[in-house]
Amino acid sequence: MSVPKKRMQLPREVVVGSNVLPEVPKLLRSVGVPDGVVAVFSGRTTMKIAGNEVADHLEEAGYQTSPVIVKGSTGDDVKKALEALDEIDADVVAAVGGGKVIDVAKVASYRRGIPFISVPTSASHDGIASPFASIRREGRPYSEPAQAPLAILADIEVIREAPERLIRAGVGDVVSNVTAVKDWRLAHRLRNEPYSEYASSLSLMAARIVMKNAKPIGKLLPEGIKKLVQALISGGVAMSIAGSSRPCSGSEHLFSHALDVIAERPALHGEQCGVGTIIMEYLHGGNWREIRETLETAGAPTTAEDLGVSDEEIIEALCRAHKIRPDRYTILGDKGLTREAAERAAEETGVIQ
């Protein structure tokens, strides 16, 4: 029996540590980019925090740089980024910022056939290393074809200075791997969906590392933040191995996306995924209390009140989550939850009162 061909994109170099921004030129040379024009993608705030410093280090090392300010992660933002790359004639992209900056950079660089390196300024989600990007079109997030970073440079001191809420959102995003893998296994068993034990094991290992280190992460200790960043990178690599977002995205992510559409003021993606994981682990018959305890220890939200959304919005999101991606089979099934089942799950887990 022949084996189908599979292509994986993985980062060639990963540097995680304190005060490592000066190593950007060395990192580029190590992955085969000794010179050329670097488009430095960043937000207005993150450009001041780290983008300008990255550009300075590159200029001192002989590279040419050109700043590209990314305001959001919509289709229009991608279009503007593509126009900027064409004007600059860039050889490589350095994405210095949070999730939106990195998502736009990985899509734009992919479409122009040039490499990009990821320089995260926060640890809020696993897009740091994944080959997928979430781009908003017509008010809704869509997964877009992109590429994994050629290299990653994560400065722990820069990430620690980000708003605490972003760190706690990262905890929620990693912990959600637990139910994502359970959903994937369920789809494999019931729908014969392709499944990778290697990718799922790596994803679960990342979740367990964060669960084990919830206390130092919650206290924003350097070693704790390092563990979180490594776990987020591992999740991204797991997705590259799987060739899909399955190892890190299941029913809890569908719940979060539904909440984005329904809620008047949605919370952060990772925060919502963490709360969604509590409920989905309950539906799977798993140890949802352990999930809740991990999030509480790390200072992450565990209730509707913590998220700043209403009980009704939680229930409505649970009822509509299965419609977000009908092709992605999860514990929610084809028909989703009844209102009664959604209300019971949210109440039993303490997400709503």
Swiss-Prot record:
Q: Where does NAD(+) bind?
A: 99-103, 121-124, 130
Residues recorded as binding substrate, renumbered to this chain, are 126, 173, 257
Binding sites annotated in the UniProt record for Zn(2+): 173, 253, 269
Q: Which cysteines share a disulfide bond? A: none
Major subcellular site: cytoplasm
Q: Which InterPro entries match?
A: G1P_dehydrogenase_arc (IPR023002), G1PDH (IPR032837), Glycerol_DH (IPR016205)
| Reaction(s) catalysed by this chain's protein | sn-glycerol 1-phosphate + NAD(+) = dihydroxyacetone phosphate + NADH + H(+); sn-glycerol 1-phosphate + NADP(+) = dihydroxyacetone phosphate + NADPH + H(+)
Question: PANTHER family under this entry?
Answer: GLYCEROL DEHYDROGENASE (PTHR43616), GLYCEROL DEHYDROGENASE 1 (PTHR43616:SF5)
Q: Which family does it belong to?
A: Belongs to the glycerol-1-phosphate dehydrogenase family.
Q: What is the protein name stated in its UniProt record?
A: Glycerol-1-phosphate dehydrogenase [NAD(P)+]
Which species does the entry assign this protein to?
Methanopyrus kandleri (strain AV19 / DSM 6324 / JCM 9639 / NBRC 100938)
Q: What is the lineage of its organism?
A: Archaea, Methanobacteriati, Methanobacteriota, Methanomada group, Methanopyri
